[in-house]
């Protein structure tokens, strides 16, 4: 009896896997509407399967992915999604590296099989770093106290927590940043309970109190210097307000902000009047790849929140000497200048 059951099972699986091509009654000139829209995008050769869903209603659908002799046919499964098997996907990407995949979607609509115009997915030769770190939080302000910093393997979508705020009194944690994508050298902020900035360098962990009498707030938005010796930060007086009638109910704004640079070795903060003026909101600093230029955004200061809709940020830059920690004497306002 056991042998008969096994034979029946294998026959069923074989029929499902070898259902064969369908007879197409109509070929469309339009590409299918899919979600997410992967048509004509470029992907790295080590990305996890790009599962997608056909937006048009249909009783059944198939997708044929191919590159040269490599071919993969899949049918829609639960929730009308195309779930691409990992092994077949990897074979396709190896074959398509530096080239592209052809994707043809067929659907059974109104008692006939139709074929959409094919689309392509370009495959680069160069792989990407296989890990992505991000903060995960509910998309509303009500549940802000449930959050964590997570990492995801982009090659298979495995996700695990770096730290969750249930470990620290459900406080806010944010602005995690890695030095040149080095997972051994990073920082992030803890707010309210256990308020601090945690600076991690290998096995060394420093807990920093970054509020000073000379700065507006503890350090906020970070950008590592490529040397790892410095981190540029904004310091912000940030507030939240609620609109009565606007569709965007929540407005988060700065009433003041400056830019500073933190020396991780000397534990000192340096700045310049060009980066910390009362007449402007300076924020969002970013070091250039060579570390000799500091980019930042700057807007003329306004009375907030009354004039929130009049704030216009320019993209600016100033030179920075890593050896002396000195800034240039002139700010370049020509990058993107939209303020009055």
Could you say what each language-model-derived stretch is?
Residues 16-17:
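C-terminal motif of bacterial Sec signal peptides marking the signal peptidase cleavage site
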Residues 34, 113-141, 214-215:
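Low-complexity, Pro/Ser/Thr- and charge-rich linker/hinge segments at domain boundaries
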Residues 132-143, 233-254, 296-313:
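Short, conserved, GDST-rich strand-edge loop motifs in beta-rich repeat architectures
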Residues 133-208:
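Conserved, compact domain cores that house catalytic/ligand-binding motifs in diverse enzymes
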Residues 150-152, 200-203, 251-265, 311-322:
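Beta-propeller blade signature
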Residues 180-182, 226-227, 289-290:
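Residue-level detector of Asp-centered blade-edge/turn motifs that repeat once per structural unit
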Residues 336-340:
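Conserved small/polar residues in nucleotide/adenosyl-binding loops
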């Amino acid at each position: 009896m056991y042998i008969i059951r096994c034979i029946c099972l294998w026959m069923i699986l074989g029929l499902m896997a070898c259902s064969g091509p369908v007879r197409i009654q109509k070929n469309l000139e339009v590409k299918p509407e899919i979600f997410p829209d992967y048509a004509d995008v470029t992907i790295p050769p080590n990305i996890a399967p790009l599962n997608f869903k056909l937006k048009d209603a249909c009783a059944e659908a198939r997708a044929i992915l191919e590159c040269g002799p490599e071919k993969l046919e899949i049918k829609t499964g639960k929730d009308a999604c195309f779930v691409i098997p990992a092994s077949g996907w990897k074979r396709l990407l190896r074959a398509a590296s530096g080239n592209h995949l052809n994707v043809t979607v067929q659907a059974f609509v109104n008692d006939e099989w139709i074929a959409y115009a094919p689309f392509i997915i370009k495959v680069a030769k160069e792989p990407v770093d296989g890990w992505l770190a991000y903060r995960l939080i509910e998309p509303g302000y009500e549940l802000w106290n449930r959050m964590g910093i997570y990492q995801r393997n982009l090659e298979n979508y495995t996700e695990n927590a770096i730290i969750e705020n249930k470990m620290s009194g459900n406080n806010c944690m944010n602005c995690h940043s890695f030095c040149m994508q080095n997972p051994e050298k990073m920082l992030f902020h803890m707010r309210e309970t256990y308020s601090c900035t945690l600076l991690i360098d290998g096995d060394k962990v420093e807990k920093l109190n970054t509020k000073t009498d000379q700065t507006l707030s503890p350090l906020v938005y970070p950008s590592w210097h490529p040397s790892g010796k410095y981190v540029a930060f904004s310091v912000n007086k940030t507030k939240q307000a609620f609109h009565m009638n606007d569709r965007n109910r929540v407005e988060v704004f700065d009433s003041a902000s400056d830019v500073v640079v933190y020396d991780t070795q000397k534990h000192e903060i340096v700045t310049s009047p060009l980066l910390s003026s009362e007449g402007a909101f300076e924020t969002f600093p970013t070091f250039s790849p060579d570390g000799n230029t500091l980019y930042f955004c700057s807007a003329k200061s306004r009375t907030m929140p009354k004039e929130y809709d009049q704030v216009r940020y320019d993209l600016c830059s100033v030179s920075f000497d890593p050896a002396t920690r000195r800034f240039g004497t002139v700010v370049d306002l020509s990058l993107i200048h939209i303020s009055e």
